[in-house]
């Protein structure tokens, strides 16, 4: 296949970052995450970057047209000639329509949207399992990375652990609910556009990637 213009979707904790890394190792395309391109546009003082900075400094949300402009500028760069892996954009249907238009203008239409699906209950368990040693700051996970001796820190031998507010189940569930509301219309839209590929993310990292690679090899 000559190009590979992709979007990677998935809820927090679904393993998007890990799978993005694996895609980049196998395919010669840049990983374009909205956070990174915003920071770069602001640092380089591009027209759109300066525009975005005004909103961010005032504590306001950056409007779609500015976000779309920053994405368009990034997709017009030379390193996207073989394709790109978009992460964190689009966030809503208006942005999805804008991306379609950008793709037509730059002759870089989307080839596929990979959605890593994991049930929210599993994600709550993954994301809310983290706890920290109060004495030395070592981090543990109740499922994936327990201390060797229960209740005792491997690093300093301390017994006092705590959980950050961000990692508490109610907070995690709230964050997931917000993301589900954002993602569901996009998943429906890309399903209708015949661009959507759902991958079961509740498995070993390598098994998930095998499925993703199979999809990409056949695009």
Swiss-Prot record:
Disulfide linkage: none
Binding residue positions for AMP: 34, 39, 60-62, 88-91, 95, 164, 175
EC number(s) reported in the record: 2.7.4.3
InterPro entries: Adenyl_kin_sub, Adenylat/UMP-CMP_kin, Adenylat_kinase_CS, Adenylate_kinase_lid-dom, P-loop_NTPase
Reaction it catalyzes: AMP + ATP = 2 ADP
Main location: cytoplasm
GO cellular component, one term: cytoplasm
EC supergroup of this enzyme: transferase
Compartment(s) where it occurs, according to its Swiss-Prot or TrEMBL record: Cytoplasm
Molecular function, one GO term: ATP binding
Keywords linked to the UniProt accession: ATP-binding, Cytoplasm, Kinase, Metal-binding, Nucleotide biosynthesis, Nucleotide-binding, Transferase, Zinc
Record: residues binding Zn(2+): 133, 136, 153, 156
Keyword Kinase appears in the UniProt entry: yes
Region annotation NMP: where it falls in the sequence: 33-62
Pathway(s) annotated for this protein in UniProt: Purine metabolism; AMP biosynthesis via salvage pathway; AMP from ADP: step 1/1
PROSITE patterns recorded: ADENYLATE_KINASE (PS00113)
Free-text comment on this protein's domains from its UniProt entry: Consists of three domains, a large central CORE domain and two small peripheral domains, NMPbind and LID, which undergo movements during catalysis. The LID domain closes over the site of phosphoryl transfer upon ATP binding. Assembling and dissambling the active center during each catalytic cycle provides an effective means to prevent ATP hydrolysis. Some bacteria have evolved a zinc-coordinating structure that stabilizes the LID domain.
Assembly mode: Monomer.
Function: Catalyzes the reversible transfer of the terminal phosphate group between ATP and AMP. Plays an important role in cellular energy homeostasis and in adenine nucleotide metabolism.
Similarity comment: family membership: Belongs to the adenylate kinase family.
Name used for this protein in its record: Adenylate kinase
Organism for this UniProt entry: Lactiplantibacillus plantarum (strain ATCC BAA-793 / NCIMB 8826 / WCFS1) (Lactobacillus plantarum)
Lineage, opening ranks: Bacteria, Bacillati, Bacillota, Bacilli, Lactobacillales
